[in-house]
A protein has these predicted regions:
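Active-site-adjacent betaalpha module
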Residues: 1-53, 57-100, 106-368
Length: 368
């Protein structure tokens, strides 16, 4: 069976609409007709199991109206990515066993949010700035150009009662440990983001065209819709779906743990396909963590991983003068090179599956 036609309900222009809500009752009816017309079997009968993992394809990242639109260098990044990924899902719905979207899920006060921090006089910090530690163990707020904006910043004291049993001294020590561990581990510098994907807000939802495709897949293939939640720990960033950026406390105890359950779910498939937002951050970090786990188990497992390079974009921060105050595209490109070198496959959504390198022969026959 070759690729399938796009279903009649799909309109790529809907990818441009923040808050697009598909009629899921009608989608379910369409799915039954589509399944019968194309003689599509249940997902449980797949001889070769394929998982597709859309990373954080949520409204806040996918639209200019969102609080953290991933525009890339083109200015339309996540919008066009959503169209291509949606078309890929529809055309290969008969081959995709499971779709496993991740959901960046945040709350008002977390370590990467500006309102979590204050200056020495209680002054607020601004988004799109950084927190760094100097040689004397003092945390400073700096601009993207490295200019020191506020010296000796600290977590807000009033948070201590619910974060750490009112032990504010513990919280201050933990934040210094956190920032220093980021540097030691070669992680991103602590970046203060605008509020985004807050649980219960419209921006947390999966972008509408992908919700439509995800549910259509569930109805056609008779498989449950999935959703992997990440990002709720108040004391650590969590770019990767497989765990927090820093998982230790300053006293040597554990702060968080690796998401081995989801790793095992994905590795139960023969082919795992990654896409989503942003290529420079959550996609990059998730695949990097996944690669570390694969190498620890069996480096040859990297050969079952495919990355849709045309279904992801990088974070860019406009400078208001036609350029970028921050552009993380080069980080994403370097990561793709690393993943290729490790044995993963970087492909395009428009490439026929049968020519994907290393694709299982049984799947290639079905796709041709």
């Amino acid at each position: 069976m070759s690729t399938l036609p796009l279903p009649g309900h799909f309109d790529p222009k809907n990818a441009e609409i923040f808050g697009y809500r598909p009629d899921l009752a009608q989608v379910a009816m369409d799915a039954f007709d589509f399944k019968k017309l194309h003689s599509i079997k249940a997902a449980g009968a797949d001889a070769v199991k394929m998982a597709v993992v859309p990373i954080d394809a949520q409204e806040d990242f996918s639209h200019p109206e969102g609080t953290l639109f991933v525009a890339g260098r083109s200015g339309r990044g996540a919008i066009d990515d959503a169209v291509r990924l949606t078309e890929f899902l529809y055309r290969h719905i008969h081959l995709i066993t499971g779709i496993y979207p991740t959901f960046d899920t945040h709350f008002a006060l977390q370590v990467f949010s500006a309102p979590f921090w204050v200056g020495p006089a209680g002054e607020p910090l601004s988004p799109h700035t950084l927190i760094v530690a100097d040689a004397g163990g003092v945390l400073n707020n700096v601009g993207l150009d490295g200019t020191v904006l506020i010296r000796n910043v600290k977590p807000r004291p009033e948070m201590a009662w619910w974060l750490c049993g009112a032990n504010y001294g513990w919280l201050v020590k933990q934040m210094l440990h956190y920032v220093e561990e980021l540097a030691r581990g070669g992680k991103y510098t602590l970046y203060l983001w605008p509020p985004h994907t807050l649980l219960g807000t419209p921006g947390h939802a999966m972008t509408g065209v992908l919700t439509e495709a995800r549910m259509f897949h569930s109805y056609v293939r008779g498989v449950q819709s999935h959703g992997e939640i990440k990002g709720g720990h108040p004391l650590s960033e969590c770019y990767s779906v497989f765990g927090e950026e820093v998982r230790t406390r300053f006293d040597g105890q554990a702060l968080a743990s690796k998401n081995t359950r989801f790793i095992d779910v994905l590795l139960s498939h023969d082919v795992v396909v990654f896409a989503g937002q942003a290529a420079s951050h959550c996609v990059k970090s998730s695949i990097d963590d996944f690669l570390t786990e694969l190498v620890a188990r069996d480096a040859a497992l990297a050969g079952k991983i495919y990355i849709l390079e045309d279904c992801m974009s990088s974070v860019t921060v406009p400078d208001g003068a036609g350029g970028f105050a921050a552009d993380f595209t080069d980080d994403a490109l370097a990561a793709l090179d690393k993943f290729r070198d490790a044995g993963m496959h970087v492909v395009k959504s428009t490439d026929p599956l049968e020519i994907w390198p290393g694709i299982p022969a049984a799947l290639a026959r079905l796709a041709s």
